């Protein structure tokens, strides 16, 4: 299924039903009083998060949504039926912005969470309510109010504990495949990953969510490649894994590659740049010898002082230990 993470839609809540003007007319009751009922409230429109949905694609093809109008009141003090509310099902992690003001209306971050977007119109009042000692047969009533209208922008930011960052072909997709049940496409050409992928990593009785986004290239912060559009999906991650290919097939310099990604991340967002970050040195199986020494030299050249992990995602070497360390880190963050 195609991944869609931003759409604009129009929302119209239901109109309230009109109040009714009616009088009691029965045999042997020649002067029956007013019995006009109230109308029904108009239907409202809500957002509802569903963990089984992972894209906004349904809203790419249908852009206008109308909640049901309330029914008018009737005689014998019968109230009109309220308009049915409408629920728009979206992925967990969806935010809503008012298109006119660009202000954030809210977000749904938990499965089943509900957020009201537009309110239905209030019901009209029937003539029963206007009876008084001086007016025994009122013909006054009120109309139902119009429902609220808004144009909104839905934005999906994936909810992941760990996000993978790196150049195209750094081995991010292979890594997420090796530690979870996710099945992103893997091949030896840039931008194999066209859209973000989520994978659930299980460590004993624990589990956490890992996100793989398209590779970042130089100029991503200005819109080059695919990375810019999807860097926003790192914002809610608790930790970022910078995956570096220690033995690039194009014979580029891993040190320069590392700094290129770090530079783009900082240009895009200082907040993202300051997130906890681990270094993962991938494809160590392609190093002929002195693996540890070469990795240590690489770490020294980039001036990295934090924890780093040497793995071969393709051979699943070091990946289990990496998953355990990430799980320990997440527990400490709680």
From Swiss-Prot:
Keywords: Cytoplasm, GTP-binding, Hydrolase, Magnesium, Metal-binding, Nucleotide-binding. It is found in: Cytoplasm. GTP binds at residues 166-173, 191-195, 212-215, 282-285, 312-314. GO terms for molecular function: GTP binding; GTPase activity; magnesium ion binding. It comes from the Bacteria. This is GTPase Obg. GO terms for cellular component: cytoplasm. Transmembrane segments: none annotated.
């Amino acid at each position: 299924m195609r991944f869609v993470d931003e759409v604009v839609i129009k929302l119209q809540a239901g109109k309230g039903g009109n109040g009714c003007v009616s009088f009691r007319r029965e045999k042997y009751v020649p002067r029956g009083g007013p019995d006009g009922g109230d109308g029904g409230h108009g239907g409202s429109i809500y957002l509802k998060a569903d963990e089984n949905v992972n894209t906004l694609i349904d809203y790419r093809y249908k852009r206008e949504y109308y909640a049901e109008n309330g029914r008018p009141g009737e005689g014998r003090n019968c109230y009109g039926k309220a308009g049915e509310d409408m629920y728009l099902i979206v992925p967990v992690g969806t935010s809503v912005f008012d298109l006119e003001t660009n202000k954030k209306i809210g977000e749904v971050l938990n499965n089943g969470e509900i957020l009201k977007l537009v309110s239905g119109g209030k019901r009209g009042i029937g003539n029963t309510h206007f009876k008084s000692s001086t007016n025994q047969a009122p013909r006054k009533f009120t109309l139902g109010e119009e429902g609220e209208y808004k144009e909104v922008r839905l934005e999906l930011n994936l909810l992941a504990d760990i996000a993978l960052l790196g150049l195209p072909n750094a081995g991010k997709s292979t890594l997420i495949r090796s530690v979870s049940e996710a099945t992103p496409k893997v091949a030896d050409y840039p931008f194999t990953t066209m859209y973000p992928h989520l994978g659930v990593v299980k460590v004993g009785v624990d589990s956490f969510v890992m996100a793989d986004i398209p590779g970042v290239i130089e100029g991503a912060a200005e819109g080059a490649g695919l990375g810019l559009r999807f860097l926003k999906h790192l914002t809610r991650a608790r930790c970022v894994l910078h995956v570096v290919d220690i033995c690039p097939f194009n014979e580029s310099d891993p040190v320069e590659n590392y700094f290129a990604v770090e530079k783009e991340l900082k240009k895009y967002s200082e907040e993202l740049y300051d997130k906890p970050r681990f270094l993962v040195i991938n494809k160590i199986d392609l190093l002929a010898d002195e693996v540890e020494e070469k990795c240590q030299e690489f770490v020294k050249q980039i001036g990295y002082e934090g924890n780093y992990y040497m793995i071969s995602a393709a051979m699943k070497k070091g990946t289990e230990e990496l998953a355990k360390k990430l799980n320990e880190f997440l527990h400490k963050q709680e």
